[in-house]
Curated annotation (Swiss-Prot):
Membrane-crossing segments per the record: 52-72, 79-99, 111-131, 163-183, 189-209, 219-239, 240-260, 268-288, 350-370, 380-400, 415-435, 453-473, 586-606, 615-635
Protein name per UniProt: Probable zinc transporter cis4
Disordered, as annotated region: 526-547
Compartment(s) where it occurs, according to its Swiss-Prot or TrEMBL record: Endoplasmic reticulum membrane; Golgi apparatus, cis-Golgi network membrane
Cited function: Probable zinc transporter involved in Golgi membrane trafficking through the regulation of zinc homeostasis.
GO molecular function: zinc ion transmembrane transporter activity
Domain of life where this protein originates: Eukaryota
Amino acid sequence: MNVNSSAFERTNRFPSFPVLKDDQKTSSDSIAAAKKKDLLSLISSKSLLSSETLGWFSVICAFSITGSGLEVNTMSIPFYLIFGIFAFVSFTTQYLGIYSFSFQPFQLLNVIIASLSMVFITLGAFVLGTLDTTCLLLLAFKLFFIRNDPTPFNARSANLKNYIAFPICLFVINHILILLGYFQCSYSVFYASVFYILLGVFIRVFYLVNKEKFEKKELAFLFSSIVVACLIQFNVLPLGTINLSVTRFTILCFMQIFCINWDGIARIQFYLGKFDISLIMALISAIINKTASQNSIKIISCLYQVGFCFFKIGSSITANLKLPDNSRIYRLYNDFIVNGVLADKESRSIFYFFLLNVSYMFVQVIYGLWTNSLGLISDAIHMAFDCIAILVGLVATTLAKMPLNYAYPFGFAKIEALSGFTNGIFLVLISFSIVGEALYRLFHPPQMNTDQLLLVSFLGLVVNLVGILAFNHGHNHDHGSHHHHSHSNHSMCLPNTTNDINIFEEFEEEKDNVEAQKMGYTNDDHVSQHEHTHENSQEHHHEHNHNHDHIHKYNEKCDHESISLQNLDNDHHCHHHHENHNMHGIFLHIIADTMGSVGVIVSTILIQWFSWTGFDPLASLIIAALIFVSVLPLIKDSAKNLLSVTDPESEYLLKQCLSNISLSNSVISLSNPKFWTNERGEVYGILHIQVSIDGDLNVVRNEVFRKLSIAVPNLKHICIQSERPNNCWCGK
């Protein structure tokens, strides 16, 4: 009784920790899993990273960044340069199908339309504030979509009053500020900005409607817009050149990628109360943004305007964020990050280094904006390209691990070679650009400020050294050549099977099992025999026999004959060039950055000692030469891999072996020999043989397989199809 009472007291004292039985634990685990699934679905369905919401938010941020005073040093950007950059962005995004849902077909006319629209709105947003630009956008959209209404203002007065009243208030405020001299802008520039924004919106929405009905109007309106663009370019109209910082203009260009998709703007319902405190604060922020002299106050007012536009004006979008494409974001994150990058130790280390690189890049950007240092911002932009290269390598690593399928029976391993080749070409272009800039600076030495170079270069060197350590001391297990010699009286087994080959074997066996379940007995009407011989660490071959004179049960166990190569004598030399071109390319990027940091440190010290700025271009020339020399082997090897080239040694052995096989009495001819070497030095091949009537198909095929296995020790996979004369499906 005492034991039971004490147990009762314990269970009452700690009621939240009951002792569960096995079935209760299983039920509890299932409930926890269900709750976790519901939470993940909630996160994925309520994600802010949907195409519509992200596009709307990017539009607002683009306007804010355009008109904010984040940097003092600016550069003059002409109209043609703005149009050229936006044309490139529009062409790339529409050609690749990125955030271009409003343009169904890819046409050059659509690229021009999107480019003109983005240029006009950028010019207008450069002068006006975030609220002004956003409200004019919404007003233009609404006026366009009710243009065919017989009584638009009577029928839709309740909806239009906010769209019209708020821009009128901002218009009056801007006029008063210009009159008082607080808003440093002329009336002509102000009116031109309003006109540009309206024109950009009308160009954009004209091509959202039925093209058959408004085809002539579209062409006429487009021609008028091109005329306006030409007048701006030749400074007949204002804002032919705008003064923007490099950072703001670069961020603006990236923002415009998401700004292409504006379908959600047409569905925004703008409801504001007469005495809404947020409305009053928005008008005050517009006044502060025009009159404040300190950048910090302007930034605070811009942030409030972004929040007001996104959550108040765009409330009809933010109130319903459950869009169908949100689940794909979580699925992409789970497949790429969790099951792809983080599942492998090597790629996980590179991913952590990528996060460190991105973090350091943002630190450089923030500190560069804070101190107005062009050197820090330039180095951050350079590091951004390195982050892109590392990200491409990580994507290639994940895609290369995708399972085989019927469409890609040899897998996706060549993606790594393609990534390595791309990174190699990119490094060659970088080395050429460094040489050109260094030669110019060598003969035209600029004035250099070396106060912050040592600190920035030292921090960059530390980050790159961490990246080298992430590769396990230079990625020594993947780079370099590994030589294996096999002579007589030595074991002659093939290398261990890689994951790709295991997957392929399982893929073939699974296909056979599916066919076995579908078919019980077969009775073929023709004489044909098709064998596939697969060689892996277990050295087995797989046969499929179809003969008209017997019945073969598919549910019987298939015959797997093991061919042991342990006691075979061979005096050939086997060479394996074991290299991952993708990781090699990433590693060379880190090495190039490391050499750059070291070069900057050494040149900075020499400049401070001898006061000659020529040490900087000399160090750049040495670094460019080292990058060029180190990247050539990567380009050469990855190009051979992409072209499916057989290495010279294996090619010589294959020619000798195939020549000996062709002399056999049972072999009439050999056709379609295709052999190639992958990046691990393993040989793959396909071969058709025609066997005489006197020869046995199985015996001849096994003999061919045995001879090839002995002659080419690094033969990994060979598919041999043995046929009777004049009975091959390929016509040989």
